[in-house]
């Protein structure tokens, strides 16, 4: 055996053994007419149960071997390297050596260099056929998607979109599941729907994104659904290439007054603020929307209502009589604790320290200043009451809850006598 070809299959090993024993073959069988016939795609010999191959039996080879002349050889033709009556129903007939039984080479040697190229050629041909089928099926699926998208009614699209609007990564309502012909085209159709979903995710936010950059609160829910459905349809109509172009078109359209729909759709304005909007609301809306407009072009910010804004501590309110009354500032327990600790060390604050505390506790300098003024007044009151009761100073600046050193008049009775 050739040491360079030690990695071979069991069929190839049997092939080499069969070529070494040509005398075991049946010399009475002669096939003058059936040497070249091939079985199309079966690949196996059609030997009978009794070991005799009829004259019409075929060896499923490649059909590339030369025809064996009736008088030249009494053995099997060059398309078979071993007898089918010894090894029936074996799909290895195309691994035959043409020189083994044609009388042109040594019958004891098998040319293994002819085995691998044929198998590689078969694999390459199968891969090319599969790729051609896949491309054809993808083209058919794209045409079917285009026709279905044009024929479907906008109301049906709106209803299906309302069913899928809760999940932003749901399948496209226009894309059918298995409209392609055969298994290959069905899988390609699913791949196309996955590609369209990936492209449409540019116009849709992630499930955790709670921003309202694409939805204006002044639009009704039906108009919002229509605008989202139109953006989806743009991505589905032209396949993966048209989806990217539609996403770019959406970015350009958002810079105008509204979103331009598909063919036959009406432009819907995204935001039209009324005359009663205050300047503070529009300013805060611009600040909120500036961080969300990256990559989507310039869009009008969403409406910000007064109840959305945080009410600052200490703001003045107007009562029923029209009088302005400042609300009582309520401090949290953490803020009170930090202020008490600071007052324990410093009863008077510098402006630098007051600014630091205001930033740390999310309060204003005015609130810090007023709190320390009130706390100093409270401390003076407690200190004055403690001095009247002759409480020692080592009890601390806050006084003491139980006054064990209270003065009783009977203590000075002996002085008056």
Curated annotation (Swiss-Prot):
In embryo, expressed in the labial and anterior prothoracic segments and the extreme posterior of the maxillary segment. In adult, expressed in the maxillary analgen of the eye and antennal imaginal disk and the labial and T1 leg imaginal disks. It holds the Pfam family Homeodomain. Keywords: Developmental protein, DNA-binding, Homeobox, Nucleus, Phosphoprotein. This is Homeotic protein Sex combs reduced. Residues 324-383 bind DNA. Residues 38-64 have a biased composition (Gly residues). It is found in: Nucleus. Residues 24-67, 169-220, 256-304 are annotated as: Disordered. GO terms for biological process: anterior/posterior pattern specification; midgut development; positive regulation of transcription by RNA polymerase II; salivary gland boundary specification; sex comb development. InterPro entries: Antp_homeobox_Deformed_sf, HD, HD_metazoa, Homeobox_antennapedia, Homeobox_Antennapedia_CS, Homeobox_CS, Homeodomain-like_sf. Belongs to the Antp homeobox family. Deformed subfamily. CDD domains: homeodomain (cd00086). Sequence-specific transcription factor which is part of a developmental regulatory system that provides cells with specific positional identities on the anterior-posterior axis. Controls the segmental transformation of the first to the second thoracic segment (prothorax to mesothorax) and of the labial palps into maxillary palps. In embryo, required for fusion of labial lobes and development of the T1 denticle belt. In adult, expression in the head is necessary for proper development of the labium. PANTHER family: HOMEOTIC PROTEIN DEFORMED, HOMEOTIC PROTEIN SEX COMBS REDUCED. A motif (Antp-type hexapeptide) lies at residues 303-308. One of its GO terms (cellular component) is nucleoplasm. The modification Phosphoserine is found at residue 216. Residues 186-203 have a biased composition (Low complexity). Its main location: nucleus. One of its GO terms (molecular function) is RNA polymerase II cis-regulatory region sequence-specific DNA binding. It comes from the Eukaryota.
């Amino acid at each position: 055996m050739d040491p360079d070809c030690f990695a071979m299959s069991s069929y190839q090993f049997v092939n080499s053994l069969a070529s070494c024993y040509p005398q075991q073959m049946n010399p009475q069988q002669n096939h003058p007419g059936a040497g070249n016939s091939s079985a199309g795609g079966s690949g196996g010999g059609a030997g009978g149960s009794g070991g005799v191959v009829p004259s019409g039996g075929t060896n499923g080879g490649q059909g590339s071997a030369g025809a064996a002349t009736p008088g030249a050889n009494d053995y099997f033709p060059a398309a078979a390297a071993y007898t089918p009556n010894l090894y029936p129903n074996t799909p290895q007939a195309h691994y035959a050596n043409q020189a083994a039984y044609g009388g042109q080479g040594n019958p004891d040697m098998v040319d293994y260099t002819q085995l691998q190229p044929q198998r590689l050629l078969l694999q390459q041909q199968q891969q090319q056929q599969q790729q051609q089928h896949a491309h054809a099926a993808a083209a058919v699926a794209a045409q079917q998607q285009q026709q279905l998208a044009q024929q479907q009614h906008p109301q049906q699209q709106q209803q299906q979109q309302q069913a899928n609007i809760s999940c932003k990564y749901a399948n496209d309502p226009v894309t059918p599941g298995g409209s392609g012909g055969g298994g290959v085209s069905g899988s390609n159709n699913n791949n196309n729907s996955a590609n369209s979903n990936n492209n449409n995710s540019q116009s849709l936010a992630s499930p955790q994104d709670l921003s309202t950059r694409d939805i204006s609160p002044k639009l009704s829910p039906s108009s919002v659904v229509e605008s989202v459905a139109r953006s989806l349809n743009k991505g589905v109509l032209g396949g993966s290439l048209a989806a990217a172009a539609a996403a770019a078109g959406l970015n350009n359209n958002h810079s105008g007054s509204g979103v331009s729909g598909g063919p036959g759709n009406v432009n819907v304005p995204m935001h039209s603020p009324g005359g009663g909007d205050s300047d503070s609301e529009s300013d805060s809306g611009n600040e909120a929307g500036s961080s969300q407009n990256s990559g989507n072009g310039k869009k009008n910010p969403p409406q910000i209502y007064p109840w959305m804004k945080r009410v600052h501590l200490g703001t003045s309110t107007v009562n029923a009589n029209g009088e302005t009354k400042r609300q009582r500032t309520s401090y949290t327990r953490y803020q009170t604790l930090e202020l008490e600790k600071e007052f324990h060390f410093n009863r008077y604050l510098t402006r630098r320290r007051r600014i630091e505390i205001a930033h740390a506790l999310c309060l204003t300098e005015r609130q810090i200043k007023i709190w320390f003024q009130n706390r100093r007044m409270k401390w003076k009151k407690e200190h004055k009451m403690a001095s009247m009761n002759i409480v020692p100073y080592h009890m601390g600046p806050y006084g003491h809850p139980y006054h064990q050193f209270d003065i009783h008049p009977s203590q000075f009775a002996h002085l008056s006598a």
